[in-house]
């Protein structure tokens, strides 16, 4: 989920060309292949003894539980040990990563490092595995003719089923589930669009460029990952540019990495691509006013940003940081404006409620705190809980700065925007691209 800069035949995700491979210690684990294990030959007496032995009955409790299609089996029932697979583990390069943390500025991150324990990693890996299984299924059903409301429902139903938290009981959605509303953005709509109740149905077309951006959390540990799909091959270079730019950002990310260097490198890679549309060659441009971002506990947007264009910031990545490395490339002006409508809402826990007088607003705020906390939510999520006549209360919360509203972000009409995104954990001795999968 992109952070807006302050002050203002079919193509699957894995079909675009890849950048040079990252040096991985442990690539994403694959499903184990079944096969026969051949032993050594034994004597006839051993064979006779074996025949006499009774065959052991299969313990049905130990039978492997497989995921369904669509995915609806909770991961806790598949991973009985409750230990979830590692993602892509990448060694730090010695060029820009100082593993000796000695400066006073970094001491403030000790509490973050102490929290990066086995439980932290397992929650993140759990959320990442949910994301992988859900997205790999929806990639098989994304075709021209599908309604975007149906696609959002498939994603969100899958996430809630696999986390085993439907979010209908008070506080249940805070344990695990959707980290923010599913983003389904077509063509020049870059980010922050989701189907809303009562809106006109949107049907996916052959010539559309669709960005799918959704987040999964387990105990507030948020995995934010996005990909783009297009059916018309004329967009291949656009998707390749953005995917390679994102992978470049992931390659450059690390402890002590300068954000300015990462941003400049991302832009250089992305803007080396061109696309030909309607017999006109158009350069792919890095979007200027939306950024990648760090992720905090229960907060999708932290206090650090990773632009996709050259910047003068002196900020560095630090040990213990969690970043959503994402890039957006456009065939338009590569500058986004707010469109009409509301994508979602987010509660600001630091805002004062002193000026809040409407009883409807107070009641709504209580519901928001109990069910979403600081996680971003949409109107669909409120109505799913049975909340009615909330518009006046929501208007009061937004006006008083207690809840922030997010509008869709768009480039100029007729342009096309693509997005790819992964979440990366900057662990003390390696970085883990937690959302990496076989698809992208």
UniProtKB/Swiss-Prot annotation:
Q: Where is the composition biased (Basic residues)?
A: 48-59
Enumerate the Pfam families for this protein.
Peptidase_M24 (PF00557)
The catalysed reaction is: Release of N-terminal amino acids, preferentially methionine, from peptides and arylamides
Return the GO cellular component terms, semicolon-separated.
cytoplasm
GO terms assigned for molecular function = initiator methionyl aminopeptidase activity; metal ion binding; metalloaminopeptidase activity
Give me the ranges of the annotated region Disordered: 1-66
Instruction: Cite the binding residues for a divalent metal cation 1.
Output: 213, 224, 421
EC main class here is hydrolase
The listed locations are: Cytoplasm
Question: So where does substrate get bound?
Answer: 192, 301
Q: What is its main location?
A: cytoplasm
Q: Which UniProt keywords apply?
A: Aminopeptidase, Cytoplasm, Hydrolase, Metal-binding, Protease
Role of this protein: Cotranslationally removes the N-terminal methionine from nascent proteins. The N-terminal methionine is often cleaved when the second residue in the primary sequence is small and uncharged (Met-Ala-, Cys, Gly, Pro, Ser, Thr, or Val).
The record's section on HAMAP family has:
MetAP_2_euk (MF_03175)
The similarity annotation says: Belongs to the peptidase M24A family. Methionine aminopeptidase eukaryotic type 2 subfamily.
Q: What is this protein called?
A: Methionine aminopeptidase 2
Q: Which organism is it from?
A: Ajellomyces capsulatus (strain H143)
């Amino acid at each position: 989920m992109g952070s807006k800069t302050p002050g203002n035949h079919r193509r699957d995700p894995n079909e675009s060309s890849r950048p040079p491979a990252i040096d991985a210690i442990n690539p994403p684990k694959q499903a184990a292949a079944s096969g026969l294990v051949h032993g050594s030959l034994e004597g006839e007496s051993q064979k006779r003894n074996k025949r006499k032995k009774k065959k052991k009955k299969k313990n049905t409790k130990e039978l492997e539980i497989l995921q369904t299609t669509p995915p609806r089996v909770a991961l806790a029932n598949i991973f009985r040990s409750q230990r979830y697979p590692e993602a892509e583990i990448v060694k730090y390069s010695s060029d820009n990563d100082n593993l000796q943390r000695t400066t006073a500025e970094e001491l403030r991150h000790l509490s973050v490092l102490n929290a990066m324990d086995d439980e932290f990693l397992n929650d993140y890996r759990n959320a990442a595995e949910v994301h992988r299984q859900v997205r790999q299924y929806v990639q098989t059903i994304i075709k021209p003719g599908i309604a975007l409301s149906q696609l959002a429902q498939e994603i969100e139903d899958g996430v809630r089923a696999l986390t085993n938290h439907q979010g209908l009981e008070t506080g249940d959605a805070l344990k695990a589930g959707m980290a923010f509303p599913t983003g389904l953005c077509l063509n020049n709509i870059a980010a922050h669009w989701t189907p809303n109740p009562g809106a006109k149905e949107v049907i996916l077309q052959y010539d559309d460029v669709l960005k799918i951006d959704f987040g999964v959390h387990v105990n507030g540990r948020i995995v934010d990952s996005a990909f783009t799909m297009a059916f018309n091959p004329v967009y291949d270079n656009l998707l390749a540019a953005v995917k390679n730019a994102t992978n470049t950002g992931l390659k450059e990310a690390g402890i002590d990495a300068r954000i300015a260097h990462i941003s400049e490198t991302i832009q250089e890679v992305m803007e080396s691509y061109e696309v030909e549309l309607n017999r006109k060659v158009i350069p792919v441009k890095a979007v200027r006013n939306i950024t990648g971002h760090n992720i905090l506990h229960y907060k999708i947007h932290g206090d650090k940003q990773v632009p996709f264009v050259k910047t003068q910031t002196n900020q560095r990545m630090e040990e213990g940081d969690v970043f959503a490395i994402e890039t957006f490339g456009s065939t338009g002006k590569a500058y986004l404006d707010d469109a009409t409508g509301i994508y979602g809402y987010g509660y600001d826990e630091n805002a004062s409620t002193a000026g809040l007088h409407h009883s409807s607003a107070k009641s709504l705020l209580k519901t928001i705190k109990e069910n979403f906390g600081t996680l971003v939510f949409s109107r669909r999520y409120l109505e799913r809980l049975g909340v009615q006549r909330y518009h006046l209360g929501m208007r009061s919360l937004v006006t008083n700065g207690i809840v922030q509203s997010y509008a869709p972000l768009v480039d100029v009409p007729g342009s096309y925007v693509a997005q790819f995104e992964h979440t990366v954990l900057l662990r003390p001795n390696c970085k883990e691209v937690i959302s990496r999968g076989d698809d992208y």
